[in-house]
Every structure is written in structure tokens, then in C-alpha cells.
A protein has these predicted regions:
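Macromolecular interaction modules
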Residues: 1-227
């Protein structure tokens, strides 16, 4: 499995240009080290919208889904630092999916990613997963592309956290998450319009109305980088 574990935390939000410099400093030098110090957090990656807009995409790769309800993680979620409390309100239109990894093929750290938020038609989850698993092997070998990863949200059985309270309990959720990785933006956009276009996904078993975006890698780290 190419992702570094059986689970992942995938998040999207908007960050204003005015808040972004401090956000990136905090995120790289306090937040990533804090999260990567939690047992089971294996890699953290932050991306910015490729079109220069306000969008941010962050993915944490986790040993397994139980990490999301672990005492060590909950302790951090319920005791955010003063700097974190100051930055949290700037995370606008947050979507936060706590996922099990369903399929993972090829590279997971690349200069560009296409993320797609989708859901299966009732009764067609198996069809959709099988079709995307088959496609993943072809995508990983195409010029400009290196990998395709499919995840499904499954909320852990935990109480609302202090971080959620600071954000106003307004987090959205993506049901299924598809992340295509590559080194060429045009190749990712072509993938988004063809093999992973809305018509193609509907034929595989997805509901209409997917959400998608292309992002550029800003920073990626593992626990070993924090030493």
C-alpha cells in the first residue's frame, strides 16, 4: 500500500491571503511537529490551490483508523495551543474526513494532486471501488501521473473536541475521497476531465455532483524529519 498506513485524515479549507504567512509558519513549525509526535501519525502533507486561490488541502497518513480515537490524539484535540486557538478561526469552510484507505496505488508524495470528493450511488459502492481500483494501476503508470488513492470517511466514536468548538462546530465531511498524484498539472486536469470526469465516475457508480480541485505541494514531513 503506497499511503503510509491503513487510514488517513483528509482536510480542505480556505485561508485568506492576509492570514496565510502566519498560518504556514504555524502549520510547519508547531502544528506538524505536534501531530507527527502522536503515535500512529506517519506522514503529513500540505498543499495550496494550484490556481493561486485560497484553498488548502492537508492529508495525514495514519497507521490505522484507531489512531483517530487514540488518547494521545484526543489529548491534543482537546488542548490546542494558544497559537492554534488563534489560527483556527482562519480555517474557513473546513471539510474534514476521517478515512479508512480503500485502495492505494503508486506514489503519494508528488508536486501536484487532484482531489475529488464523491459518494457512491446506494448499492453501488462495490462497483465504484472496483472500477477505481482497476483505474489506479493505469493512472500510476501514465506520463505526468504517479499514483491514485481512494479513501472512505468513517467517523470515530468520540465526543466533539475543543478544536471543533473553536471552529464553531461547522466542519463538513466528504464521504469518499479520491487523491490522484502527479508531477504535471495538465496531466491531472486531463485525468479530471476524462477518466475521472463526472460522466465517467457516474458510469462507475458515483452520484452526480462531485467536488474537485488541483493543489500544489508546499510541505511534507514524517516523524523522522522532526528529530
Amino acid at each position: 500500500m503506497s499511503l503510509l498506513g491503513k487510514a488517513a485524515l483528509a482536510m480542505w479549507w480556505d485561508m485568506s491571503a492576509q492570514a496565510r504567512p502566519e498560518f504556514e509558519h504555524w502549520h510547519a513549525h508547531e502544528h506538524f511537529p505536534e501531530r507527527l509526535g502522536i503515535p500512529g501519525f506517519r506522514r503529513a502533507s500540505r498543499f495550496a490551490a494550484a490556481d493561486g486561490g485560497e484553498g488548502v488541502f492537508v492529508m495525514y497518513e495514519l497507521e490505522d483508523h484507531a489512531v483517530l480515537a487514540s488518547p494521545a490524539y484526543l489529548a491534543r484535540l482537546n488542548a490546542p495551543s494558544p497559537w492554534s486557538v488563534r489560527m483556527m478561526p482562519h480555517h474557513r469552510r473546513m471539510v474534514r474526513s476521517q478515512c479508512r484507505v480503500l485502495e492505494s496505488c503508486g506514489g503519494a508524495t508528488a508536486g501536484q494532486v487532484l482531489t475529488i470528493r464523491l459518494s457512491p450511488v446506494a448499492g453501488r459502492g462495490h462497483d465504484l471501488r472496483a472500477a477505481l481500483a482497476s483505474l489506479a494501476h493505469r493512472v500510476a503508470a501514465q506520463p505526468g501521473l504517479v499514483g491514485l488513492h481512494l479513501m472512505r470517511h468513517e467517523a470515530p466514536a468520540i465526543a466533539p473536541t475543543e478544536e471543533q468548538r473553536v471552529r464553531g462546530h461547522s466542519d463538513g465531511v466528504a464521504d469518499w475521497v479520491l487523491v490522484a498524484c502527479g508531477y504535471d498539472t495538465a496531466s491531472l486536469q486531463a485525468l479530471s476531465e476524462a477518466d475521472l470526469g463526472d460522466e465517467a465516475l457516474a458510469a462507475m457508480g458515483a452520484t452526480p455532483g462531485t467536488w474537485r480541485g488541483v493543489y500544489t505541494l508546499g510541505y511534507s514531513a514524517t516523524p523522522q524529519d522532526m528529530d
